[in-house]
Amino acid sequence: MSETIKSDKTYVLDNYFDETTMSLHLKADRPILRKKWTPWNRNPVMDEKIITQDEMDALIQQIFDEATNEKWNYLEIDRKLSKVLQLGPYRIVIVYPPLSDATEITAVRPVKKTTIEDYNLSPEVMDLLTNHAKWILVSWAPGSGKSTFVQALVLVYHQNHHIIKTIESPRDLMVDEDVVQYSFTHWTHDEVRDILLLSRPDYTVYDEVRNTPDFELYKDLRLTWIGMLGVIHATKPVDSIQRFIGCIEMWIIPQVIDTVIFID
């Protein structure tokens, strides 16, 4: 049964979110914008309040203070003009001028935590996902619930006593503590490949497959018979497969993908 996401810890961003807020969009000297979640709609809501540059600077400092004070918070990307952090349930992107025309903060968090039963999958599909499919892609547009579905499927694999590892950037999947979460922040694709090939998990969750090195790593892991559960952006199911074309040899694709789950 699905449930509202709640954290045992408190964060400064809690002041900007309620139970229906999916994302927060802040730009210096502009009104605060939130996206709200309802079962059939995702509505942008603009506040009358304008957030100043000084308030943005203070908020950013609080975010960094919280990121360095907790074990499970991460600074995933640290560039001169952009930062990506995982702060509890919040995925935070901070961008500075001149990359952007003003200081910007975008914070996203999951609204609901689901179980696989919430998706009302047919017995045939459940049997496929749990007993047969080993080369799975989960696709659709950003914000469509791909990662939420993956979390529910990972829970099933964990309950079946499979060894699971994830590759994420940032590490924002909400999974059991038994699941090891890797990031490219401190590792190269080659290093992650070596670790996974040596540790031999039953399943590797790749959230998400974006660029050529990702496609190559996904292929290499799959061809060594590691179960793969990949997340990819695509507007149609066939696009999920077409995105692999040009990144890996076409004749290998049937050996890398056997199932596409399209979140519509």
Model-predicted segments: where are they?
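Residue-level signature of catalytic and energy-coupling elements of molecular machines
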Residues: L24, I94, L221, W225
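Charged, alpha-helix-enriched surfaces in structured cytosolic catalytic cores
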Residues: Y16-E19, I51-A58, E76-S82, Q86-P89, ...
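Switch/coupling sub-region of P-loop NTPases
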Residues: I163, I167-W251
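Conserved beta-strand/loop subsegment of P-loop NTPase cores
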Residues: L229, I257-F262
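P-loop NTPase nucleotide-binding module
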Residues: V111-K112, E117-P170
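N-terminal accessory targeting/assembly segments
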Residues: M1-R79
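Flexible glycine-/small-residue-rich
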Residues: L26-A28, K36-T38, L87-P89, Y96-P98, ...
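P-loop NTP-binding catalytic core
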Residues: M46-D47, D57-W135
